[in-house]
Amino acid sequence: MRQYRRINNLMGWFTFLIAAVVYCMTVEPTASFWDCPEFITTGYKLEVGHPPGAPFFMLTANLFSQFASDPSEVAYMVNIMSALLSAGCIMFLFWSITHLTRKLVCPGVEKMTTGQLVTIMGAGLVGALAYTFSDTFWFSAVEGEVYAYSSLFTAVVFWLILKWEDCADQPHSDRWLVLIAYLTGLSIGVHLLNLLCLSAIVLVYYYKKNPNANVKGSLLALAGSMVLIAVVLYGVVPGIVKVGGWFELLFVNTFGMPFNSGLIVYIVFLLAVLVWAIYESYNYASARRANIAFLLTIALLGIPFFGHGVKSIVFGIVFLALVGACLWGVFGKRLMVSPRTLNTSILCLTMMVIGYSSYAVIVIRSSANPPMDQNSPEDIFTLGDYLGREQYGDTPRFYGPAYNSKVALKIEGQYCVPVSEEGAPVYQRKEKESPDEKDSYEIVRHKTEYKYAQNMLFPRMYSSANEHIAAYEQWFGGYRNEKGEWVNGVKGRLIPYDECGNPVMVKMPTTWENLKFFFSYQVNFMYWRYFLWNFAGRQNDIQGNGEPEHGNWISGIPLIDNLLYGDQSKLPDELKANKGHNVFYCLPLLLGILGLLWQAFRGQRGIQQFWVVFFLFFMTGLAIVLYLNQTPLQPRERDYAYA
């Protein structure tokens, strides 16, 4: 086994070397299109980019920019950073593949045959190098964007849970989980995509702790992973800012202290409670004190306080009461938490907060008013809006309006006004009228949420922008006739609508039309097309909006391609010779399918691996499609989001 580890390590570094050489030789020499110049600038001069920011990317890019001989080389050095980080991703992918393959080829065997060794190394090389030269990943690897860094974090944390799996029965195995939590916190400062691999991580943990796992247990583990993602995404990330804002208002507006005094007290208090909670849960001299410390920790992190206002506080109190009931065994000993689990949970939360603290860079640099200071997140309240991406608005995902929905109206006196709900207050620093006036925050407005008269489940066609409405119609065969009038493609259904006493009919898409758009555009065109670019082939690099000659996936097999898009031999020469054109004849796709089938039919361990890999793909692919709810006419191809 020692010889296997040596060979495995050497082959991993060999794949890193191949990827690093290829990416560095093909790296973008200057700044690419879209966000790359912005990210390079934020790294070089530590300026503040668009929400929600990428502070840890900024710090790393700044380090690499120091190696530039003059300012003209800065972009090149940041691009080299992406190339090396992507090569690191390939290396950890290799080690993950060999780990999974070894578990199925020779489980529990200390000494393996030469054939088994070649099989394991071959699987790792083929899988890692196939990803190395895939269209989307290669493109992201050679430019100064956050997705190369995000891919590395995903690869590392998945590899770490496999390392934990190898030593899970040892006394200090939890250190791998703590390291995963720290890297997860750091990854928030690069991109939130890394959180999506938590489902696969939880499944690996569950299957290791329950070798004879059943379907029910697997589903419960998946549900738990979704809760874990929600705790980080909707709890820790906005919660720290929210509770910090409460402290700031208390100390500034109530106690009359200077700006940021409440935030400083909050940070010191939070650190003290985290240290106390770690101490109590480690020594466990008093279960009562340990439980109180844990409850105080999750309260200070803002995890239970979903929403805003009184409802947020009530929900938080109920949440804390339920967690406390579990800790004290009110619901039975089965739901009680062991001292080791409690201590590990607190350590993981602490390390995640330490990693997440990279966002302090955003506030510090914004306070210096650099040339690029988007949204100016100089205090805890503007930071909250910055993290919440408030400028982009809300996207309905599970229930909400369609593109033709009308705002609900009501009569107030002699006027017809829209129905709305007052949201969270927006605070800003009050301008002083005299030097002696104390610092304070004032409410400048409340976030307003308008109510719609017509709503539907799982709304996929929701944007009321004129160009999007036209695109929805076109995806259902709509067109302009000779008179310039739209012939609608969406048949829809008519719903009565009371416009303050004036009855009108509103056309709403049917549930079937809504689902048809979801599968035909969002799933097929905006995901499977990108997926097959990398596993089958790509027609060209011209952005497509459904045309048969632009940006489609192809296989390289004329029978299939001509059936899908027409005779490809009749395309103009400039499209045939497009540099983005490549064909793999579906070989990577077939290899992937064969690998999944081989896993699925290798007994219980194989089927468990199958579900781990499946949900890693699902959460970093189709789950993003569900969450983004993309509109047609995207400004650029979005394949980078799924790499």
Stretch-by-stretch model annotation:
Residues 13, 80-112, 156-160, 590-598:
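Transmembrane-helix motifs of polytopic, lipid-linked glycan transferases
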Residues 27-39, 49-61, 76, 372-375, ...:
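Extracytoplasmic catalytic/substrate-binding loops of multi-pass membrane glycan-assembly enzymes
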Residues 12-18, 99, 103-139, 148-159, ...:
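Membrane-embedded helix bundles of polyisoprenyl
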Residues 1-22, 88, 113-125, 321-354, ...:
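Start-transfer (signal-anchor) and selected internal transmembrane alpha helices
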Residues 24, 71-75, 79, 104-120, ...:
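Aromatic- and kink-enriched transmembrane "portal" helix at the membrane-lumen/periplasm boundary
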Residues 112-118, 157-176, 203-214, 275-286:
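Membrane-interface transmembrane helices that cradle and orient dolichyl/undecaprenyl
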Residues 5-33, 131-133, 191, 231-234, ...:
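Transmembrane signal-anchor helices characteristic of membrane glycosylation enzymes that use polyprenol
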